[in-house]
C-alpha cells in the first residue's frame, strides 16, 4: 500500500483506543478467518476463481503487474519471460489468484519451479531482489517501498495481469463500526492515491 500509513494515522485520530492488528498474506489465505468472524475484513487482490458470494466486496483500486529487478541490473530494452529462464525468481506464496496465474505463466515460459522462491513476506521479496539479484512480478505501486529508489521495472513483451484490490468482509457478521470506518478510509485514500498517479 502506498496509502497505508496515512490511512492508519487518520484512523487512530478517530479511534485512538482501537486495537489494530495487521497480517501480511495473500487474500485467499484470509478468507476462512473472514468467513468465521475471526477477522473483521481484509484488503487484497481478487481473482475470478475466488468464491465470494457470502462476502461483501468493496472494490478499491487497480494496479498493473510489472517485472521488477534491482537498480544495479542493467536494462537494455524490452525482454520476454522466455529469455529469463536462467534467472532466479521470488514470488508470493498462494494457491489461487493472480500469483497462481503468474506462476503458471512463468512455467509456460520454461521458468522452472526450482528457480522460484515463494514467500508470504513482502520484505523477503524486496530483500532477495535487492541483495541477491532475484526477479519478481509485483503491482506497479509496490516498486518503491519505504520511498526507496533501488528497484526498476524491466519492460517485458509478455502480457501481465492487472491486480484488482478490494476490501472483503463477511455477510454473516455485522462489521464493527471501527472496521467500517477503516474500510471507508481505505476507499477514500485509495481514490486519492489513484488520482495522484494520473
Language-model segments: which ranges?
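Beta-alpha-beta core module
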Residues: 51-58, 63, 123-172
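Alpha-helical segments flanking ligand/cofactor-binding loops in enzyme cores
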Residues: 31-32, 58, 82, 126-127, ...
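C-terminal effector-binding regulatory domain of bacterial HTH transcription factors
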Residues: 14-15, 100, 140-148, 158-198
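Short beta-strand-centered segments that line the small-molecule binding cleft or hinge
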Residues: 6-10, 27-65, 69, 152-154
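Hydrophobic hinge/microswitch elements
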Residues: 26-39, 45, 95-152
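Secondary-structure junction motif
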Residues: 1-3, 75-76, 87-109, 175-183, ...
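Flexible hinge/capping segments at coil-to-helix
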Residues: 55-89
